Amino acid sequence: MAVTWHKHENCGFVMLNNPPVNAINQKMREDLIDAVTWAESEGLERVILSGMGRSFAAGADTKEFDQPAISPHLPDVVNRIETSTVPWIAAIHGTALGGGGELALGCRYRIARADATIG
C-alpha cells in the first residue's frame, strides 16, 4: 500500500509511504480516499497525516506525467479530506511541495518542523 493507517484509541494515524520522497501517484490518491472513509467509519476524533521517510510528500509522481489522468484526481482527494467529518492534522517534515502542499492545506490543522519546506 502507498498509504497505511492504524488507530490508537480515538486517533487515526495515516502515513504516506512511497519512497524515497512520497511522490503522490494514483495508488496513493486512491488509498487516501479509502483512509478518509475508514476514519469516518471508525468514528475517530482526529487523524494525523504524516509521511514516512525523509519527506511529507514531495509532489506528483513524475512517472505519471506522460500518462492519461486517472481518477481520483488530487483536488477530489483534498476535497474529501477537507469535508471529512473527522478533523485531519498534517504533521509536516522534510518537504511538502506541489501536491504535498495541497494535501497539507486540505487538512484542518497543520504542524511542521522548523526546517520543513512547504510550497
Question: Whereabouts are the PLM-identified features?
Answer:
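Nucleotide phosphate-binding site architecture
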Residues: N22, K63-D66, G119
